[in-house]
Swiss-Prot record:
GO terms for biological process: symbiont-mediated suppression of host innate immune response; symbiont-mediated suppression of host type I interferon-mediated signaling pathway. It is an enzyme of class 3 (hydrolase). Plays a role in the inhibition of type I interferon signaling pathway. Mechanistically, specifically interacts with 2',3'-cGAMP and cleaves it via its phosphodiesterase activity. In turn, prevents 2',3'-cGAMP interaction with host ER-resident STING1 leading to inhibition of downstream signaling pathway and type I interferon production. Coiled coil: none annotated. Keywords: Host-virus interaction, Hydrolase, Inhibition of host innate immune response by virus, Inhibition of host interferon signaling pathway by virus, Interferon antiviral system evasion, Viral immunoevasion, Virion. Its EC number is 3.1.4.-. This is Uncharacterized protein C129R. Belongs to the asfivirus C129R family. It comes from African swine fever virus (isolate Tick/Malawi/Lil 20-1/1983) (ASFV). GO terms for molecular function: hydrolase activity. GO terms for cellular component: virion component. Its main location: virion.
Length: 129
């Protein structure tokens, strides 16, 4: 069953993708259980996504086995409105994941180190002139 899409303006999409990281396709299968993802379909429809339940997941879609990601909207399977759904990798054009605190810390540290390195290069360049 196809879920009716909610149309989001480009501004709303941008806001919903804040703090999410675009994942290159060759790394999709490494996204872990529990990670929250958002995505664009191959028809360029923005989806707010859900939490990874299984990935990678071999799904039979229209009598064909496809690599897919299985998502859920909650971790409480007894919650009212709990649903799971499968999205084939081939039906996704862009996949974004919300990094955990460890990854955000690593990213922050890399950015600080890069900034310090750039400052050192500028200092050395000014001394050479």
């Amino acid at each position: 069953m196809e879920h009716p899409s909610t149309n989001y303006t480009p501004e709303q999409q941008h806001e919903k993708l804040k703090h999410y990281v675009l994942i290159p396709k060759h790394l999709w299968s490494y996204i872990k259980y529990g990670t929250h993802v958002r995505y664009y379909t191959t028809q360029n429809v923005f989806r707010v996504g859900g939490f990874v339940l299984q990935n990678p997941y071999e799904a039979v879609i229209k009598n064909e086995v496809k690599m897919a990601i299985r998502l859920q909207n909650s971790f409480n399977t007894k919650a009212k409105g709990y649903v799971t759904w499968t999205v084939a990798y081939n039906d996704i054009s862009k996949l974004y994941a919300k990094p955990d605190a460890i990854m955000l810390t690593i990213q922050e540290n890399v950015e600080k180190a890069l900034h310090a390195l750039n400052q050192n290069v500028l200092t050395l360049a000014s001394k050479i002139r």
